[in-house]
């Protein structure tokens, strides 16, 4: 039984694609409703005001406004602060 595989044979050469996780919209950026703010595994960031959480823990905006990162009860949270429209 050979301990070396034949020529041009290898057991390596596989790798999984990256998951593209992380913060997609940073503090102060203006977002529209439905825009993804954070892609994450688990709840590193928790949803705050005007932010929803998807089945895979993705945080998304439920209303238009400005992204704001903060903390509440020792947890990192993400809020959307509505942008004041100038009265015409």
Curated annotation (Swiss-Prot):
Encoding gene, per UniProt annotation: rpmA
Q: Name one GO molecular function term.
A: structural constituent of ribosome
Q: Check the record and name the Gene3D superfamilies matching this protein.
A: 2.40.50.100
Q: Which UniProt keywords apply?
A: Ribonucleoprotein, Ribosomal protein
Please report the name of this protein according to its UniProt entry.
Large ribosomal subunit protein bL27
Q: Which GO terms describe its cellular component?
A: cytosolic large ribosomal subunit
Q: Does the keyword Ribonucleoprotein apply?
A: yes
* Short name of one Pfam family: Ribosomal_L27
Q: Which domain of life is it from?
A: Bacteria
Q: Could you tell me the Gene Ontology terms of the biological process aspect for this record?
A: translation
Does Cell wall biogenesis/degradation show up as a keyword for this record? Answer: no
Q: Which family does it belong to?
A: Belongs to the bacterial ribosomal protein bL27 family.
Region annotation (Disordered) maps to 1-21
